[in-house]
């Protein structure tokens, strides 16, 4: 029996639903997987499960002011589906785009919302996964089986954002909140706001709140590189004025953004001092003449060792220039009744404190995995090309790029998984298992010399690992994987079929 075949099963008095492919997650990766399954395998059964009440994943959960993309949408959009909006888009615009994909690919009936995957167990005898699911809407436990499991749930612990232990936090009399759990009724009009953090979320929240707040202070322990980018690309305007197919416009813009991005990442790796100077020079015209750019926007790490925060039309810089927002680089001594006292002795008054201090990573949604009764410890497993796990049969996962747009890798992975499923059918194989030899050395999923933001470094001990050689490595670079993944040899001995 190949992974495309089904057979009825029962448990107790009820039937257990079986699908050929079970996709976990109805965000960008999961909906993209659904498109590829629908397009490449019209006769194959599949379902998409998601914990939340609606589609979108991160874009559904992020409700904080100004929530938007931190990548351009011409590369964040799917390869098959032209993006027709601005280069940088709001969460609402992205959700509308996903709705179009769901409708065009007839995915609505395949998505099961409020289905939280709790555990999954593989049986080699049956060549299938048994998946335990908790219905969030009814609190009942249900079971499904599948021939192939495709984990597209992302890597954020949405219900457990990262917030450090701040001394004296209980003393502050106003609200303290994390962007991940933003209250819908919060009113910051005319209020003094302190946003703790310096990453993409802080760079989004600060200008959005500054529109109506009395003043917003971004308090950071260390700086982040930031860059202003046009919300609407001039080339997009020019191309859309021409009488050419939208698909051409999309592909031209997509390639343009990819090559521009590749050039900056190349410069950052090969000539980091030149890349640093370029970024600082790009920021200066947007900021007040007396602004201390070296102190506030010149981090110690080299460019792209952590993500560069993208500012649509330089919105946060504009808030600073207009006096609506400011940046303070210091460490917190303690919260007080009326704000925050810093190590320098300065006190920041606040009515509201926002802790934009990052996220915790989740390894496969913290789902319990077993293979033939043995628990899987992912922290002791290497990945096959950053897509499958050593010793875990018939399971693929999507982990996008740290620097490039997430969806670029999601599309490449969908291509490879589709090719693998077809290859299994051609071989008459029921299962495929990545199998690394005992001499493959375990290395961190992300090399700190390459990419080392706090949310990644905090999670290295519980994340899956890279090996010391191909195909047990993860390149993290689209410029390389756009060639290596389509050319991956599925019969090089690293995958065992049965």
PLM features: what roles do these ranges have?
Residues 13-18, 22-23, 28, 32-33, ...:
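Rossmann-like dinucleotide-binding core of oxidoreductases
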Residues 77, 175-176, 386-403:
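Short FAD-binding loop at a beta-strand-to-alpha-helix junction that anchors the flavin cofactor
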Residues 16-23, 28-111, 220-221, 286-291:
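Beta1-alpha1 glycine-rich phosphate/pyrophosphate-binding loop at the start
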Residues 82-100, 112, 196, 267-275, ...:
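Short beta-strand to alpha-helix junction loop
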Residues 411, 415-498:
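C-terminal active-site-capping segments
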Residues 277, 286-349:
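Alpha/beta-hydrolase fold catalytic core
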Residues 85-157, 334:
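Feature captures the FAD/FMN-dependent oxidoreductase FAD-binding
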Residues 24, 117, 143-156, 193-196, ...:
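Short hydrophobic core segments
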């Amino acid at each position: 029996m190949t992974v495309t075949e089904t057979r009825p099963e029962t448990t107790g008095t009820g039937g257990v639903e079986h699908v050929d492919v079970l996709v976990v997650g109805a965000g960008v990766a999961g909906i993209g997987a659904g498109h590829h399954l629908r397009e490449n395998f019209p006769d194959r059964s599949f379902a998409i499960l998601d914990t939340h009440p609606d589609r979108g994943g991160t874009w559904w959960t992020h409700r904080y002011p100004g929530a938007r993309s931190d990548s351009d949408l011409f590369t964040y959009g799917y390869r098959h589906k032209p993006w027709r909006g601005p280069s940088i888009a709001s969460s609402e615009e992205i959700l509308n785009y996903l709705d179009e994909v769901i409708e065009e690919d007839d995915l609505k009936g395949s998505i099961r919302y409020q289905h939280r995957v709790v555990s999954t167990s593989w049986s080699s005898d049956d060549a299938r996964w048994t998946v335990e699911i908790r219905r969030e809407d009814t609190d009942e436990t249900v079971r499904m089986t599948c021939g192939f499991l495709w984990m597209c749930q992302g890597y954020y612990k949405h219900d457990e954002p990262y917030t450090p232990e701040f001394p004296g936090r209980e003393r502050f009399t106003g609200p303290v909140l994390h962007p991940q759990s933003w209250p819908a009724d919060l009113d910051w009009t005319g209020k003094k706001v302190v946003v703790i953090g310096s990453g993409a979320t802080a760079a989004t929240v600060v200008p959005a709140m500054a529109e109506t707040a009395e003043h917003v202070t971004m308090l950071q322990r260390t700086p982040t590189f930031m860059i202003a980018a046009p919300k609407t690309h001039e080339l997009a305007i020019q191309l859309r004025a021409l009488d050419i197919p939208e698909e051409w416009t999309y592909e031209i813009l997509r390639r343009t953004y990819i090559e521009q991005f590749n050039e900056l990442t190349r410069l950052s790796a090969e000539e980091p001092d030149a890349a640093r100077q370029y970024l600082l020079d790009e920021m200066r015209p947007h900021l007040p003449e007396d602004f201390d750019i070296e102190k506030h926007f010149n981090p110690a790490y080299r460019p792209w060792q952590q993500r560069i925060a993208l500012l649509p039309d330089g919105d946060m810089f504009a808030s600073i220039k207009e006096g609506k927002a400011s940046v303070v680089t210091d460490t917190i001594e303690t919260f007080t009744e009326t704000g925050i006292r810093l190590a320098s002795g300065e006190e920041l008054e606040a009515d509201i404190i926002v802790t934009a201090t990052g996220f915790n990573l989740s390894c496969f949604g913290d789902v319990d995995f077993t293979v033939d009764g043995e628990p899987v410890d992912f922290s002791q497993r290497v990945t096959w090309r950053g897509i499958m796990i050593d010793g875990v049969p018939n399971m693929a996962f999507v982990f996008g790029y740290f620097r490039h747009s997430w969806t670029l890798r999601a599309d490449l992975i969908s291509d490879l998984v589709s090719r693998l499923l077809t290859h299994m059918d051609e071989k008459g194989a029921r299962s495929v298992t990545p199998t690394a030899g005992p001499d493959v050395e375990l290395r961190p999923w992300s090399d700190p010399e390459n990419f080392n933001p706090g949310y990644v470094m905090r999670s290295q001990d519980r994340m899956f690992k890279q090996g010391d050689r191909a195909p047990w490595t993860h390149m993290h670079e689209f410029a390389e994987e756009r060639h290596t993944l389509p050319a991956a040899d599925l019969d090089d001995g690293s995958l065992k079929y049965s």
